[in-house]
Amino acid sequence: MASLAVSINQFAVEFSKKLAESAEGRNIFFSPWGISTSLAMVYLGTKGTTAAQMSQVLHFGSIQDFKFGPDSEKKRKMECHSGKSEEMQSDFQTLTAKILKHGNSYVLKIANRIYVEKTYLFHNKYLEDMKTYFGAEPQSVNFVEASGQIRKEINSWVGSQTGDKIPNLLPDDAVDNKTTMVLVNALYFKGTWEHQFSVQNTTERPFRINKTTSKPVQMMSMKQSLQVFHIEELQTIGVQLHYQNREFSLLLLLPEEVEGLKQLERAITYEKLDKWTSADMMDTYEVRLYLPKFKMEESYDLQSALRDMGMTDAFNQGKANFSNMTSERNLFLSNVFHKTFLEINEEGTEAAAGTGSEVNFRIKAPSIELNADHPFLFLIRHNVTNTILFDGRFYSP
């Protein structure tokens, strides 16, 4: 399972870079875990080059590397090229169970489903594996004659799965009578801080988008003992904010310079991020932290980004190979829709008034001020499995 977390985190960094190429001056927020899980359901039905491309983009090959080691290259290639691995499917099952383990300290809702034109009949083996490993059932629908109604039904289902936080995943033109297969993935997360911000300390302050432009934000503040890490070569400082029970944490990466985000984004790799955010790189500081209250609701049609990353055949009617899903020809992936919702406030990641507290330090720790009043990167990590649940960039209020 550790190898699957590595694959998801590698994908997180690369996908974030790809989104950033076409999101100049905009916020970014997505779930690498959510996208990987939903695409794994499609991957289960692929063969040949379609499977190999998906494996490469999603770093599923890393799972075989991790399991077999360098001395089993031939076996690894055979397993990876076939695009299938019971270990990988089982890893997704185990990882999802750990992440979705319900506790009183957080709520995590995920809506994952494949919709396929009803003229394509599923193999029984595919249906069985989907139920076993993903707890999911592909839906056969009538895109040809009722695409508008199907879109409404999809949106209604996603809304019901996310507590109506994500009610309109598919836009009006998302599907039509030529649609053969659509993948939908939506996530909603609500967590409570281990140390809440005091509402009384929240004040309006300027957020500096660049050296010449700023916008007002509601800026929260706290004085607390927090874990801090320094990235000296990129003049960036990071801080970890735990949610209750410490199963999840928010990791904030703040460049020292107002316009330092581009340099950080260009330099970041999975290996560097893993090193920077590891426990042995963190020290405890007495931190005066300023963090904006913000809400993010981001939607993506992932086809363009995934194509650019090398996953082309799955979207090509003449090349897609979904023969492990169905015996019918010409089935291809029409679109992949992904939407996330996040709200950061005094209590945590969803609205409610909280009465925060400040700490008086009996053991003197180094003191530092961290003012997130300019663009920064952030992650929400599942600490038990070291999986990046959400990946984001806050550029502008």
Swiss-Prot record:
GO terms for molecular function: peptidase inhibitor activity; serine-type endopeptidase inhibitor activity. It holds the Pfam family Serpin. GO terms for biological process: negative regulation of proteolysis. A motif (Nuclear localization signal) lies at residues 74-77. It is found in: Nucleus; Cytoplasm. SUPFAM superfamilies: Serpins. Protease inhibitor that may play a role in the regulation of protease activities during hematopoiesis and apoptosis induced by TNF. May regulate protease activities in the cytoplasm and in the nucleus. Inhibits plasmin. This is Serpin B10. The lineage of its organism: Eukaryota, Metazoa, Chordata, Craniata, Vertebrata.
